[in-house]
Amino acid sequence: MNQTTKLCAATTLALGTLIGATVVGTASPIHQEAQAATTPYYTYHGYIGHNANFIMDKHFINAIKYDNVTFNGIKLAKTNATKKVEKYDQTFKGVTAKGNEANQLQFIVKNNISLKDIQKAYGKDLKKENNKTKESDSGIFYYQHSKKSLGIWFVVDHNRVVEVTVGHTPYKTSK
């Protein structure tokens, strides 16, 4: 009788474990979550003046391509506004009433960034606007992935970048 009790107990335990494992296995749903693609972005805080090297950063260039650039809490976006705001050493144009979006950003470059530096960073996508100057190392150079995306314009004077504009509207000098 002792062996029969042990056999029944072992069978009950084995069956209980098998059924329990099966129930637990099917009770938890399988999650196959898709990872959302992250849109490239670039955020800048503070003064730019002597620290404009970020304009050659591949992450900044990629963020321009994807229209996802923010400076000092103001996102560059297509706006119909006309308000102009000075923040740190930057001029924002087309700032919305809430002050969180602007159509264009301009700043003066105070460190030595050369035409060759931006040509290396932007490659063959960097173009010269209208060839208004006969000098090859001066004029307005720009990069714009498509006509509907953000663009960046560089004012170059004798191989030196002196002013930068980032925005959706064509460049107009601040001078």
Swiss-Prot record:
It comes from the Bacteria. Residues 1-36 form the signal peptide. GO terms for cellular component: extracellular region. Its main location: secreted. Keywords: Secreted, Signal. The keyword Chloroplast does not apply. It is found in: Secreted. NCBIfam families: IsaB_fam. Belongs to the IsaB family. This is Immunodominant staphylococcal antigen B. It comes from Staphylococcus aureus (strain MRSA252).
